[in-house]
């Protein structure tokens, strides 16, 4: 989940910075076609900047340390497990990192399949059996082998393009209306530049949040495939055991609305649309039924 959250936050930040610069400098599409081209350039630009920065951002955010030379038996096992699985799926050896955190967690990121990173938390190494940890690592290796980050980037670029395009069209209409421009003036002016800038920023945030429903759906879909990839690499039972360990480790104490933010995803409310991972029960059931194993 961390790689998705970091990717989306970085992407949103880049989009907002681009939007502010364009508004302050007065650089805007002179026509609908021009606006679409500009939206595409900055929409995909934000997504690819996020992708290129993903490893650096991820390591910096968690304080992760890349293992250059294994210092102990645990690090040696981790590096060799990643190496073995990478060879099985025909990708270059990813960088391997550990970060200090009590949570059972791991993530994979990187701009290319052959220039990737796999990071695991100390909580995962301390609280999971080797078989369970092996399955989690295989899940992350499957994300890399499947090219999920690049595919997510392309999807995010398309979503960004439409968010920027629609937001700026509506912002221009709002600004022109509040400025009292005539129809002729409206076609050549965005009205009050301050109103236009504020309206476009607010609309980009709102539409960006709504558009995240699409990217989160795709993320949940790819999680099922990564689970299946792990099952193929290390065995279905190991992956099921790892998910069951996650389920017992993250049994929620919160009530009501807060339950939606728990990793096990038991809540079946509207907020599930914004979850990057499917509920653990659904993932376990998909593995048991073999729903994604032959896809």
Curated annotation (Swiss-Prot):
Top class in the EC scheme: hydrolase
Active site as annotated: 140
Cellular component terms (Gene Ontology): plasma membrane
EC number: 3.4.24.-
Co-factor(s): Zn(2+)
Chief subcellular location: membrane
Keyword hit for Transcription regulation: no
A single BP term in Gene Ontology: proteolysis
Name under which the protein is recorded: Protease HtpX
Species in which this protein is naturally found: Photorhabdus laumondii subsp. laumondii (strain DSM 15139 / CIP 105565 / TT01) (Photorhabdus luminescens subsp. laumondii)
Gene this chain is encoded by: htpX
